[in-house]
């Protein structure tokens, strides 16, 4: 019975096989094909070839066919095809050339589903011929298993079949959609594919559509698409590239026998792409193969192939030449159950879910209707993946990665599985170049590499590049960057021995920087950079050899190594292992810069190749299989362990540089294991600085990308720990925003803005959510929607821009699916106005994928320390190092600064050492530098230039981007696409600094104040964009290419001479062209082309003999000159095939971009056309040879009684000027450089001062001038000069300005303009808002403008303006809520609290303006320009504008303008009455807050101050107020105080740097009056007392000398230096400005308002708070602890001798600032996410404990205490160390922990109010003490459960407001030691 069954099966198989091929017959087919490439949307200019031949098939057995492909010819096509790629050709046999095929017989084995499972050819058949045979056979492989068994059945619904199968073809083994339909002869008439004469047949049309997204085998080569998460270039839809393949086969079926006959088959394979990724015009590569039955004959018995060679199924076969065959095992195979192509980390649940979704979505159903199938064919992009939300891109990309990997698992065919190893290439050896398929150089020689690389060719090409680099003018013409790309390709194909030989020929060592052969040096550098960019194993070994031989070292070697992660093409496990050994090499380890660069480069490569699941896009895993084996995760962890141990040793040695480097290295890996290595430091088990902890958080950035869900959990724990430092929390937030944040999580974050006390955190959350909500583009739509759900929840409180902020600004262009995004993050600083951490990133968005183009980031531990250290190096005079003895007069109530500090028991704060880091993209690589104090020693670095000229020689060639794709087309020949951005940066300079004024005697370390700088500079920047697509014809070593090359070059060769005089604030610079002859300044070329190129040629495509440029029309040439008027003539040439210049495109792509973005993306959406632009400096026709730039600045104070002396230059003194004993004569300060002496502008300056000074009488004077002159050898041919002076007065409330501009050009045209402006703005009340409302703040402006060619022909414009406050505005302010609040405060005698200050400011704002303009002799040109400006405004404000062209009264030679704001100053009406028309702008909204600040004038503030105050409302003018009964601190915390009966310290400043004077401000109240004393150092004392009567101003003394200031300002000097200015305000209050100390006092006898500069931040103590940006820290006592009550704060700062301050020593009253830390993970989450907990055996405590038992009911026993503590030990907050991580450094510090203890007392759950000391796990108690501690108790219920859970999670609750306190005695360990 079994034999019968087997026989039936064999007969069925035989019958199935014979259904298509009749035994004894010979089938002859005519084969025709073509493959063409073109920019078809630009022009129908094609390059490619045609193919024809004859295919003969004879059935040998029921399952074996024998065949032969013979009479094969090809013909080159390189011409215009007006009808497109399918244009018919005239058959001319003379153009056909024979294809060098063997034409040997082959054998095909047919499977049971009509599939060709095996192809056998002769051994001498080359691979390329085998692939072409496979391409032909793919046309006649048709699966007809679904066709009904009855051949006579002609019903259409039974013959029509739609189904899917996986089928092999030359393009891959992929899913194929079959659509079989009957077709009549009538339907075949319009397009007769084949003539069918038989009558007794049914004709079927078989349509096959190949789905490249679902493949078991997909022969393809991909490199460089790492950042393109939506791009799988070999699949159907790959972002900017799409690929499709369809086959139409005509099959006849005999009605009698049921036998099928393939009559005709034609396959179309199309690749459509945007050649430069973002073009609006696309290119195409199309292939068509047509097989048509010509005749059926009797069999002629084709012989079998001898000797036979099995070449597998029909899938394209690679040509393997070199490699390591032993490595081709299952460990490197890609299987469906693997995590990814390279990932070594565990699969997350998210990944598993993605896989299951993929499996369910990819299963096909044959029941789908034919209409649906047709619909899917019509809309191939509407796939399941594309229909998913865009915000799930990370999941989708991971799903697609899995899908690509699963292509290699063919479970349906045993033959396919068995040949999987043969399908992939052997892995490259470390000394050999990898065999890269599809790329021309590797397959162009009969399917193999074009011979062995001759080192002589490398040497010749490098020297050619070098020689052309010496002539930058010809760089673009000679295609240097194209040659560099060719050189890189040669190096990629070379073995190590060949590279070694080339090195011997090219290496050139320069003994002296100024004495070397530049040509030889540039040749070496070109070769060096090509090896760095090659990315092959041989290139890596070559780089290592160079380092060991010291051919490259230090920074040069660091730059080369930094490129490796991006350049590496095949980073196999052996490649990684070799790189790791190189990192550990002592030579590498000992090189400065190189050691850190190598570590960081290796760690990044480790992530890209072995951790990240996206490697399928970056590396050729479809060629070589996995880059690393499946079990490589263990090796990865070994590498990570190495870095972790290095980090541990660095922490032990307190080496900040190594700590940051190895932290960054661990972060680069992006592996889950780094969490357990960072955790001991982040949770405080090991002591590191705050900056180093912040660096660890930021270094989780790559982990966020590899495992976003796990990272989100960890970052959320860090952020939500309110006891953590603000820097850690903000850093965690910024990384958290890079994960997939849901709407719920956005809302959860938004809630923190309502209750979080830390302003830095709140500000960061606000800005991050608001920015995310405004992101545009379809790919961020979901993120924006989620963020928008949380915007309304945010707190409405505004925060200064100096706080932590996150901004995302993007621009998206829907028509081309391209955009860009700019991300800026900053972390605010406690001690400075400037942020302590910044990060900027410019991202290109192409089809939803993000590619980082520019990146910069930096962080420092203290901004103030950096600024002070730099200023210390360049400051003019030394400050006193030590405080001198007090110079004050005897006063029982006053102490010197040292005594005040001792009296207050002032403690020094622990300050972390200065450290930081900077990272940025640099020459195609990412660089990371650490900073410390020596990093800012600029003075010492600059002094090198004093000794001898310093030579700079930078010559760097690199690729900013390189993308490569290759796969076979239907003809079996390789298709390839490459996109490169080669870039050249060449900078040579010889610089020397010559001091002209020697350093002060005894101070040689000071930087000179007067010096010259000379430098010969040559800078060349060039970059190309090369986009090439084509096909390779292996049989004739040709490639048929279509491409675009854009070339750009900028050259700046200059001789620079600069004179700097810091004493006089003057600078002069001469810029002279380096070359005397004409030279090219800039060039830009765009060349679309087609070519037929010899692969062996080293000539760039655009220079090849058979290259044709694509020009859609005859080119037009333009040329011209400009610059004659200035004396420097520039000549330009422009050639293009465009009909006209599209200004609209230019403006939309350049002017509307931000400058930095336009630099990168000015080319987006640019049409593809030919252009050639050149710009020259025409030196021969330029009389001017030198450009001279001069600038000067001056500011000073002048006094009324010194006006006459001012003109004689006698007593006017500038603030911050040197004392007289250090001043030099004018002769000594003169610059000695010939023709470069700074012109004496004192005469001009005094002229302007004489003009502006009378209007103000006394006040501050400012002067600035800038001039540009174009000079010849002797004459000045043109000069342009602008100078101005400004005087502002506190006496008569005037501001006077004078501007003068003059120009004389080379054509003797003289232009001048004089502008004089006088502004009268009264001093408005500052203290009482009622007085401000009653005061008339009306201001006036008068302006006079003269301009023209000569004074006789001058035009005049007179301008008068008046600014008023309307009654409506006055009423609005008076009735506002803020005014009511202020009234209530004033009733309590508090006049200067924030509400009153704000309403007083609002009361003085002006809302109605009137201007009248008169003019004389205004030229028509000027009138026309004015009207054009109005036209732009009219267009912009179109909805709001009304014009009256027939006014009742016309103005003559005048214009009247009236501006009226509404009461809230958020809308404006403007009325203009002009001679030709009247215009009304109605209800124009003023949405922008800066525009409102600019236009809503306030007499108290200048315009720029108003804008700055809007950006920084709190810290532009930081203010502290001590009012009658309340204090408002610098950080805006308000608290009430009783009368200050004793002297109390208001502000005590003790700077960390010596460049600032120490300051003390103290106050005392008596009988409702306040006395104020200010100490400035130990030499100056100011005293302010209440006025003698109500009509007088307060009394002011300096060192007991009365200062008169009521009638005129007092200019106060000390030791010949102006130190202060005092004057009276309208309210009789005193305004005292300490100029050099940035302190301003407003004092009226009862209260004081103090404005302080931002350099005081976080360096003051007292009633005014800490000034660190956080109101919560304002109650900080001198002992650096925090009190809760105002009484304790005042006690802490009361200046009374022998005062009992013991209360402040109680830790419960004065609480130390401590950071409460939490564990990052718990056991459950660690197991779920694959993160190993930190191992105690690794010399650290465990991250979690297994004990979680609850405490017993005993109240105070030792056992109870111990039990309850152990139950919580694994998840509690831990103590801080040296930088607040640990209180003391004890030998057993790892055994001590601080935990909240939980006990049960009287049936209640009690939690210790403070964290108590406990012994850590694996430690034991050696001694203990018994103490009484405060516990907070809760009855059983939800509240108790809530706090218990918080404590167990590691959160330290705030019990400060709890009243249910119980004191319990507990046992606390005093010493813990390890059990091990």
From Swiss-Prot:
<feature type="compositionally biased region" description="Low complexity">
    <location>
        <begin position="387"/>
        <end position="404"/>
    </location>
</feature>
<dbReference type="GO" id="GO:0005319">
    <property type="term" value="F:lipid transporter activity"/>
</dbReference>
<feature type="glycosylation site" description="N-linked (GlcNAc...) asparagine">
    <location>
        <position position="1398"/>
    </location>
</feature>
<feature type="glycosylation site" description="N-linked (GlcNAc...) asparagine">
    <location>
        <position position="1770"/>
    </location>
</feature>
<feature type="glycosylation site" description="N-linked (GlcNAc...) asparagine">
    <location>
        <position position="932"/>
    </location>
</feature>
<keyword id="KW-0964">Secreted</keyword>
<feature type="glycosylation site" description="N-linked (GlcNAc...) asparagine">
    <location>
        <position position="1318"/>
    </location>
</feature>
<dbReference type="InterPro" id="IPR001846">
    <property type="entry name" value="VWF_type-D"/>
</dbReference>
<feature type="domain" description="Vitellogenin">
    <location>
        <begin position="21"/>
        <end position="838"/>
    </location>
</feature>
<feature type="compositionally biased region" description="Basic residues">
    <location>
        <begin position="1209"/>
        <end position="1225"/>
    </location>
</feature>
<feature type="glycosylation site" description="N-linked (GlcNAc...) asparagine">
    <location>
        <position position="1719"/>
    </location>
</feature>
<dbReference type="InterPro" id="IPR011030">
    <property type="entry name" value="Lipovitellin_superhlx_dom"/>
</dbReference>
<feature type="compositionally biased region" description="Low complexity">
    <location>
        <begin position="411"/>
        <end position="420"/>
    </location>
</feature>
<feature type="glycosylation site" description="N-linked (GlcNAc...) asparagine">
    <location>
        <position position="211"/>
    </location>
</feature>
<feature type="glycosylation site" description="N-linked (GlcNAc...) asparagine">
    <location>
        <position position="1424"/>
    </location>
</feature>
<feature type="region of interest" description="Disordered">
    <location>
        <begin position="322"/>
        <end position="424"/>
    </location>
</feature>
<feature type="glycosylation site" description="N-linked (GlcNAc...) asparagine">
    <location>
        <position position="1012"/>
    </location>
</feature>
<feature type="glycosylation site" description="N-linked (GlcNAc...) asparagine">
    <location>
        <position position="1469"/>
    </location>
</feature>
<comment type="function">
    <text>Precursor of the egg-yolk proteins that are sources of nutrients during embryonic development.</text>
</comment>
<dbReference type="InterPro" id="IPR050733">
    <property type="entry name" value="Vitellogenin/Apolipophorin"/>
</dbReference>
<feature type="region of interest" description="Disordered">
    <location>
        <begin position="1192"/>
        <end position="1239"/>
    </location>
</feature>
<dbReference type="Pfam" id="PF01347">
    <property type="entry name" value="Vitellogenin_N"/>
</dbReference>
<feature type="glycosylation site" description="N-linked (GlcNAc...) asparagine">
    <location>
        <position position="1055"/>
    </location>
</feature>
<feature type="glycosylation site" description="N-linked (GlcNAc...) asparagine">
    <location>
        <position position="1532"/>
    </location>
</feature>
<feature type="compositionally biased region" description="Low complexity">
    <location>
        <begin position="1741"/>
        <end position="1772"/>
    </location>
</feature>
<dbReference type="InterPro" id="IPR015816">
    <property type="entry name" value="Vitellinogen_b-sht_N"/>
</dbReference>
<keyword id="KW-0325">Glycoprotein</keyword>
<keyword id="KW-0732">Signal</keyword>
<keyword id="KW-0758">Storage protein</keyword>
<dbReference type="InterPro" id="IPR015255">
    <property type="entry name" value="Vitellinogen_open_b-sht"/>
</dbReference>
<feature type="glycosylation site" description="N-linked (GlcNAc...) asparagine">
    <location>
        <position position="1417"/>
    </location>
</feature>
<feature type="glycosylation site" description="N-linked (GlcNAc...) asparagine">
    <location>
        <position position="1760"/>
    </location>
</feature>
<feature type="compositionally biased region" description="Low complexity">
    <location>
        <begin position="330"/>
        <end position="368"/>
    </location>
</feature>
<dbReference type="InterPro" id="IPR015819">
    <property type="entry name" value="Lipid_transp_b-sht_shell"/>
</dbReference>
<dbReference type="Pfam" id="PF09172">
    <property type="entry name" value="Vit_open_b-sht"/>
</dbReference>
<feature type="glycosylation site" description="N-linked (GlcNAc...) asparagine">
    <location>
        <position position="631"/>
    </location>
</feature>
<feature type="glycosylation site" description="N-linked (GlcNAc...) asparagine">
    <location>
        <position position="290"/>
    </location>
</feature>
<feature type="glycosylation site" description="N-linked (GlcNAc...) asparagine">
    <location>
        <position position="409"/>
    </location>
</feature>
<feature type="domain" description="VWFD">
    <location>
        <begin position="1518"/>
        <end position="1703"/>
    </location>
</feature>
<feature type="signal peptide">
    <location>
        <begin position="1"/>
        <end position="16"/>
    </location>
</feature>
<protein>
    <recommendedName>
        <fullName>Vitellogenin-2</fullName>
    </recommendedName>
</protein>
<feature type="region of interest" description="Disordered">
    <location>
        <begin position="1729"/>
        <end position="1788"/>
    </location>
</feature>
